[in-house]
Design a protein with these regions (language model features):
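Short helix-loop-beta connector
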Residues: 139-145, 167, 229-230
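Gly/Ala-rich phosphate-binding loop of Rossmann-like dinucleotide-binding domains
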Residues: 159, 163-164
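Adenosine-phosphate binding glycine-rich loop
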Residues: 6-10, 246-370
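Glycine-rich Rossmann-fold phosphate-binding loop(s) that bind the pyrophosphate
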Residues: 151-152
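Rossmann-like adenosine-cofactor binding region
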Residues: 193-287
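NAD(P)-binding Rossmann-fold cofactor-contacting core
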Residues: 165-192
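N-terminal Rossmann-fold NAD(P) dinucleotide-binding loop
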Residues: 155-156
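N-terminal ligand-binding/catalytic initiation module
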Residues: 1-126, 130-132, 142, 337-340, ...
Length: 370
């Protein structure tokens, strides 16, 4: 069994491989070769008077890859507001700047535990890879420009993914903090050898772009449909789109089902917090800590409100049919399967290269029936 840390993941995982692994695994969903359980979060009041503890899990498996994965994360959450009253989610584990997220990989052939993987790099890469899949199938083949709203980790892997599937030459990036967007522009221009310019408004980032991405930690709409122009392809991270985006879009696909929906009788506070169907503990005073999140037309919608990647792979729904259409890819869903596909790619590459920290498999086995 291997323990694989983030520096090792970064060394062995390319964006091209990340996109291809997901594409193959997702195409197993309509045939029954792949399966996943959507994300479930459990919230418990914590000692912070403005925060909550959150435990999150998601699972997925691929018969063809022979792997099952569970991703687990333990966070202390709090939600500061800016001068305009907009919420932003912040989190940590133990102390600010530290995080705890793990992917456990198991063999579906004999059940053996295969690996424990730090989830930091995989998390950003699998989400960026999903956005790349959407751009691969829905953006115009002649797309050369990107309008990026956001300058964090997701904005970095999103741009990597767009460059993997399209000949990207020019990028405009906006985020509220000037030094952050300037740092992003300098870093990504050097890394990808393309022109990246920071701009002063989100509208300026969107104007004239072929691919538009909202890659933020905002809990309200960061991208407005009024800014969109014919022919653009649009994607998101967490539903930070206003309802007009959905009105403007001619073609909409969702990646998959993002969150499980418990029965109402199982969840007293269904719809509070980040997702519909979270399991939330707390008394009336503690529940007041939770933010009131913007919910766009694609957030909290019925799982079958829009065609999914299953439909895309099966050819059941048309993709872009003209250069003037606005296309939208809701980049959430199938998370557990993403971790299985990308985790397997990382694990197999580590075996080939002799990387990772060896752990005795017998530590994780027992002779008492479970």
């Amino acid at each position: 069994m291997l323990f694989i840390d983030n520096p090792t993941v970064e060394k062995v995982l390319s964006m091209d491989e990340c996109i291809d692994a997901q594409d193959i695994a997702f195409r197993g969903l309509p045939t029954g070769a792949s399966v996943h359980r959507p994300r479930i979060d459990v919230y418990v009041p914590t000692d912070r008077t403005d925060g909550y503890f959150r435990w999150g899990t998601m699972e997925g498996a691929s018969k063809d890859l022979g792997v099952f994965a569970i991703r687990m994360k333990s966070d202390i959450l709090y939600w500061p507001q800016d001068e305009q009253g907009f919420w932003k989610e912040e989190k940590y584990n133990t102390e600010p700047g530290l995080y705890c997220g793990l992917v456990m990989l198991f063999s579906t052939r004999n059940g053996a535990p295969l690996a424990i993987i730090n989830d930091g790099i995989i998390q950003h890469m699998r989400v960026g890879g999903g956005a790349g899949l959407g751009a691969k199938y829905l953006s115009r083949p002649d797309s050369h420009t990107v309008g990026m709203i956001g300058s964090g980790g997701m904005a970095r892997t999103y741009l990597q993914a767009f460059c993997s599937v399209r000949d990207i030459r020019h990028v405009k990036v906006y985020s509220p903090t000037k030094k952050n967007r300037e740092a992003y522009a300098a870093e990504m221009a050097g890394k990808l050898e393309i022109d990246v310019q920071p701009v002063n408004t989100p509208e300026e980032a969107v104007d004239g772009a072929d691919i538009v991405a909202a890659a933020t930690n905002a809990m309200q709409a960061a991208l407005k449909g009024a800014w969109l122009q014919p022919g653009q392809h649009v994607t998101d991270v967490r539903g930070e789109l206003d309802d007009d985006v959905f009105t403007r879009a001619d073609v909409i696909f969702r990646q998959g089902v993002a969150h499980s929906r418990p029965r109402n009788e199982d969840v007293e506070h269904m719809g509070d917090g980040f997702n519909n169907g979270d399991y939330i503990a707390g008394n009336a005073e503690e529940l007041e800590r939770l933010p009131k999140r913007h919910r766009s037309a694609g957030v909290g919608a019925a799982p079958k409100a829009y065609p999914s990647f299953n439909d895309l792979a099966s050819g059941n729904f048309p993709l872009r049919t003209s250069a003037d259409q606005v296309t939208l890819y809701l980049n959430s869903g199938n998370q557990g399967l993403q971790f299985a596909a990308v985790g397997a790619a990382v694990y197999n590459r580590c075996l080939e290269l002799g990387l990772g920290h060896q752990l005795p498999t017998e530590w994780f086995l027992q002779d008492i029936r479970d």
